[in-house]
Curated annotation (Swiss-Prot):
The keyword Ribonucleoprotein does not apply. It comes from Caenorhabditis elegans. GO terms for biological process: mitotic cytokinesis; mitotic spindle assembly; regulation of mitotic cytokinesis. Residues 178-200, 260-302, 310-386 have a biased composition (Basic and acidic residues). Residues 24-103, 168-386, 481-512 are annotated as: Disordered. It is found in: Cell projection, Cilium; Cytoplasm, Cytoskeleton, Cilium axoneme. Residues 30-39, 78-95 have a biased composition (Low complexity). The gene is maph-9. One of its GO terms (cellular component) is astral microtubule. InterPro entries: MAP9. Expressed in amphid and phasmid ciliated neurons. Residues 230-239, 502-512 have a biased composition (Polar residues). This is Protein maph-9. GO terms for molecular function: microtubule binding.
Length: 512
């Protein structure tokens, strides 16, 4: 989240990014910069390139805007304001000095306001800010570190201003350098960087000395709080004093030579913290030992109580067992006595019943025999009645069946007689029809023979005349012509059969 917010704030100026990080509402004020500051310095401060932070420069593969300014200078040939050449270093030192002073003053004001606000917010001991960097409250606070590197020549000019500034800060931080101090907002001037710069300036000429301002802003955005793990006394004891010292050094105000009063306060504060940590550890150790002793005593007492309870429980169990055995014995004895009494009573009752039975055995046998005879008679009578009823039903069925069979036989006889009559009638009709047909044929033959003797000479047919001058393409014969031809052929055959004279142009008309 910190990298994402840093990418979002690249296009803003340094003042705007600081206001956003510290959570101060930006008012519509004009930045108090000196008139001698050049446009190149403003562009350098407002440039979107990320300045170096305590984590180092951003990787060159993430974005082209995040590249090192030296690489941009070598690749594109464009010079940046805070990395000028040796020729322009002497001319722009005064302007840069004023702008840097204004910038540091503004940061000091912001620092004082934030310290006052934290003092008001953390007045009660319950709302103390955790010192550890991985604490959940520190995640939501911004972490600001500013490294100011100056050459030895410029240290003499700024010595007075820096001492006054450190004095003010020490006076303000006396009341605020408590356990509730916000360790995330710190200013530090690296001694190693100053010594390296002094060594370099001895080798380089005065004209090539240049002052660089590196404002590194690292934002710790609010992250999701991790699930708290149960901390035991063993885990707390494993944390060494070196880790505590490193954390305290990171949370120190200034580590430079010029801030001797703050170093003394810081050392006192560190000693106080170490003493508190030792006392806390001793208290924790004593509490742990006391807790272990109490736990041991509690376990011993619980073991003794358990043994006593086991003994009491065994005694009670034995008593219960003895009581149960006695009760079972009594119960079994009572059951045996009751069973003996029941057997005796049953034997007495049996003897009484046997005597009564021996007296009335004969009577009972007679009665039983009579009853059996009656039952047999009744059964025989019922069987005879059933047989009679079955015979009567069978006879009635037989009669009906015979009647039906007789009726069917009579019907068959009648049908056969009727068929015979019909056949005889058909035969007589056929014989009569044959006789009539034969007589008719004889008559017809006699008529034909008689007619064949009288050959009639007919007039020749009139030639055909068309109804108009138009002649049809195809001549269609009429049905009368075919009929006349058939008649003529039949007449010829009759004539030949009767051995008559051959007809020349005559045609015989058949009789109908």
């Amino acid at each position: 989240m910190g990298e994402y917010q840093l990418h979002q704030s690249r296009n803003l100026s340094v003042n705007q990014t600081l206001d956003e990080i510290l959570g101060i509402s930006r008012k519509s004020e004009t930045t108090t910069t000196s008139s001698g500051s050049s446009g190149a310095e403003k562009n350098a401060l407002n440039s979107p390139i990320r300045p170096p932070t305590r984590h180092g420069r951003e990787s060159s593969g993430s974005n082209e805007e995040n590249k090192d300014p030296i690489q941009l200078e070598n690749g594109n040939g464009s010079t940046l304001s805070f990395l000028t050449s040796s020729s322009s270093a002497t001319s722009s030192t005064a302007a840069r000095r004023n702008s840097d002073d204004d910038f540091i003053k503004k940061l000091n004001d912001i620092r004082r306001r934030s310290l006052i606000s934290t003092m008001d917010a953390t007045s009660t001991p319950t709302t103390s800010v955790p010192i550890h960097f991985d604490s959940p409250r520190r995640e939501s606070r911004p972490c600001l570190e500013i490294h100011v590197e100056e050459s030895p020549e410029e240290l003499s000019t700024h010595a007075v201003e820096i001492t006054e500034f450190h004095r003010d800060l020490s006076e303000n931080s006396l009341g605020t350098s408590t356990d509730h101090e916000d360790p995330s907002l710190t200013f530090r001037v690296d001694k190693e960087l100053e010594q390296s710069e002094s060594k370099k300036t001895t080798k380089r000429p005065a004209s090539g000395v240049k002052k660089t301002l590196k404002a590194s802003i690292s934002i710790d955005a609010p992250k999701p709080k991790p699930r708290p793990r149960p901390q035991t006394s063993a885990n707390l004891s494993t944390k060494t004093i070196k880790d505590k010292d490193q954390e305290m050094m990171q949370m120190s105000m200034f580590g430079s030579k010029l801030n001797k009063p703050s170093d003394a306060h810081h050392k006192e504060w560190l000693q106080k913290k170490e003493r508190e940590i030792r006392e806390k550890k001793a208290k924790e150790k004593a509490a742990a030992e006391q807790k272990a002793a109490t736990e041991k005593e509690r376990r011993e007492n619980s073991a003794k109580l358990y043994q006593r309870w086991v003994q009491d429980h065994d005694k009670k169990a034995k008593e219960l067992k003895s009581k149960k055995t006695q009760q079972e014995r009594k119960k079994s004895e009572n059951e045996k006595t009751t069973q003996d009494q029941k057997l005796k009573e049953a034997e007495k009752n049996y003897e009484m019943w046997k005597r009564e039975r021996s007296k009335s055995v004969t009577d009972i046998r007679k009665k039983l025999e009579q009853e059996e005879d009656k039952k047999r008679k009744k059964e025989e009578e019922a069987k005879n009645e059933k047989i009679k009823e079955a015979q009567a039903a069978f006879l009635a069925w037989k009669r009906k069946k015979e009647e039906l069979l007789n009726e069917e036989a009579e019907k068959l006889k009648k049908e056969q007689v009727q068929k015979q009559l019909e056949e005889s009638e058909k035969m007589t009709r056929l014989s009569l029809a044959n006789e009539a047909y034969e007589t008719w044929i004889e008559l017809k033959e006699s008529e034909r023979e008689f007619i064949a003797d009288f050959v009639l000479i007919e007039a020749p047919p009139i030639p055909w005349l068309p109804p108009s001058n138009l002649i049809p393409r195809q001549f269609v014969r009429s049905s009368n012509g075919n009929r006349l031809r058939a008649r003529s052929q039949s007449a010829k055959s009759i004539a030949k059969r009767s051995r008559s004279r051959p007809g020349t142009t005559t045609s015989l008309r058949p009789f109908r």
